[in-house]
């Protein structure tokens, strides 16, 4: 089961990569931080429906008001759920770790 999704921006569009474990998701998130053009957003946990921000965004999130935190967290979760539903509903190809590693090789 691909419980986690690493969410990132590429060419002004949201994308995600499925991961089976949180450790794997954090490794992909860290790898994305070093890739040109990638803007990692965070990790979505489909089982708990929680979102974990990448470090810079976590700092910004922590400084926001409670109302703002609720709004941006809801938006991030909605984006993650929409990406997952899109992949489940259509015959499109789901992103994988191999795809991310091959993009810049």
Show where each model-derived region lies.
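Short aromatic-glycine-(Arg/Gly/Cys) micro-motifs in beta-strand/loop hairpins
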Residues: 1-15, 45
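Short, mixed-charge low-complexity intrinsically disordered segments
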Residues: 33-105
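Surface-exposed loop/edge segments in extracytoplasmic proteins
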Residues: 12-18, 50-53
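A short, charged, amphipathic alpha-helix used as a generic interaction element across diverse proteins
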Residues: 8-9, 19-42
């Amino acid at each position: 089961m691909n419980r986690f999704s690493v969410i990132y921006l590429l060419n002004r569009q949201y994308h995600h990569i499925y991961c089976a474990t949180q450790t794997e998701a954090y490794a992909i998130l860290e790898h994305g931080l070093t890739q040109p053009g990638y803007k990692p957003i965070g990790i979505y946990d489909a089982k708990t429906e929680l979102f974990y921000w990448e470090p810079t965004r976590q700092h910004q999130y922590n400084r926001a008001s409670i109302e703002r935190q609720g709004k941006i967290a809801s938006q991030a979760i909605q984006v993650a759920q929409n990406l997952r539903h899109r992949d489940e509903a259509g015959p499109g190809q789901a992103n994988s770790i191999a795809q991310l590693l091959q993009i810049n090789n």
